[in-house]
């Protein structure tokens, strides 16, 4: 199971500390020995310790969509990701990894908060 950390800042003026996210990930480093990444935006910071099963060289998270306006982290296994990926690619979505969880990002773009209903996993 991967490790996920996050900070959401309610105060627009206060910067989010990447250092704090790094320390959070260090505390759960045993959850993901295959890589670590932190992304900091205006009001949110996300961190991820990766435990790789699919797309061993790619697939680092957090993941961004094509327009870079949706970001996500996910720890899970999506059994029907191949079918969903084909459907989404037919609709014009561009995938940057071969991971199963990237379908969640693009499904969210398609159907919004109802996307989990389409997942088998």
Stretch-by-stretch model annotation:
Residues 1-121:
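N-terminus-centric sequence/structural signature that marks the extreme N-terminus
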